[in-house]
Amino acid sequence: MLVTINVAMLLLLAVFLYMLKRKNVKFSVRVMIALVLGILLGIGLQWTYGVGSQEITSTMPWYNIIGNGYIKLLQMIAMPLIFISILMAFTKMTIGKKFGRIAFFILAMLIGTTAISAIVGIGTTTLFDLEADQIMQGEAELARGEALVERAETMQDVTLPQQIVELFPANPFYDLTGARATSTIAVVMFSVFLGFAYLQVSKREREIAVTIKKGIDAIYALVMGVVRIVLRLTPYGILAIMARTVATSDFGAIYSLGKFVIASYVALIVVFIIHLIILALTGLNPIVYVKKATETLIFAFTSRTSAGTLPLNIQTQTERLGVPEGIANMSGSLGLSIGQNGCAGVYPAMLAVMIAPTVGINPLTPSFLIAVIFIVAISSFGVASVGGGATFAAILVLSALDLPIALAGILISVEPLIDMGRTALNVSGSMTAGVTTARLTGELDTQIYNTPAADKPLVES
């Protein structure tokens, strides 16, 4: 009976959100309302039944139909969107003629900002005096640590040359399912090969190239149609996800890890400010960027998926920031698997500095710091973009530094809370790379960038 009431409350709130849609309330406003309602519902459930209660445990599978169902739909569109977005980038003549230069700037920005993120993570951890042995480990943390060790053991069986080979797409259709940890970068590589093939065809067989371009444009339009349908479900997905996250969170554990949570968000905010400084150094107004990117960053924050944010990422760059479609498609897509500032930069660097003292290593020695920064930057290749990316990056970094991986499990109770900020920073990093690259290559439409954002929403109701 109580479970039925809990589910009914969620459905009533979903109906309320639908009514707001019927009244033409802006998409971004409905997402924020869903976020607040989800938090309040989660707090209400936990206050009524208590953390870990049977009522909450029995209710969550029903909430997951909406929450996890929404995440599954985001995963469904991620790979096709990455594939067609990069392929479409090559049909734009501007990027076709300047591909090498554009790719260099995008990769340099993504990897460079990841290295900077690692430095910020190291500095913040030192400033807050964080150490892994200061944190109490319960059953959940120990179980998480054991799971990470098991996963690391399977990864350690593969040599470095084999890991590099794994980046290549032996079966692109298999990688389009996202079945491997490196599937995203494999799809990117396959798309790039097809893109170069298109450029060759366009030089020799113009009529065939025109037909191919029309086909790519048609598929892109079809995929984007599916994307828009899925994105319209965002308020309902966010409502269920936030209700579940808050209802199942152990606030006692979060309070005990409050120092780490605060340190993490300080680091994430500092890196975001660095993004703004980079834009300012190229002669752009960073305040304009903040105003125009906020809606997309809020979506990334609440959904916790960089891949699911890709369509909004690209649309924000092209329609609001003046980035050509080719550069926006490439920076957004590459940013899903390379140089994620939050998940592959700040987080593993903080963990490495926290864990090092437990095995007698001074984390402030120059040799250790240089090793952390270098390994973090290199290991940012191939990080997953729909959940689990930070864990994958942490295992790679800790393994390379020969640090105990099990201690990474101590943060499981605050993982969802921190992951929200990390995801938003990942998306900001890829957008900054796109805008900066367009600026440096002379492709940025500064008139669009400096024009106040129109009332047209990113996601149509």
Say what each PLM segment does.
Residues 78-82, 234-237, 305-313, 343-350, ...:
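Transmembrane helix boundary and interhelical junction motifs in multipass membrane proteins
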Residues 180-186, 266, 281-289, 321-328, ...:
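Membrane-interfacial loop-to-helix junctions in multi-pass transporters
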Residues 61-72, 101-105, 166, 174, ...:
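Short amphipathic alpha-helical coupling elements at transmembrane boundaries
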Residues 40-48, 112-140, 263-300, 305-309, ...:
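Transmembrane alpha-helices that form the ion-translocation and gating core
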Residues 425-461:
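Cytosolic juxtamembrane C-terminal amphipathic helix followed by a basic/polar low-complexity tail immediately after
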Residues 83, 188-191, 292, 327-335, ...:
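Alpha-helical transmembrane segments of multi-pass membrane proteins
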Residues 1-9, 13, 18-22, 28, ...:
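Signature of multi-pass transmembrane helix bundles
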Residues 299-378, 446-455:
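Helix-loop-helix junctions within the multi-pass membrane cores of secondary transporters/permeases
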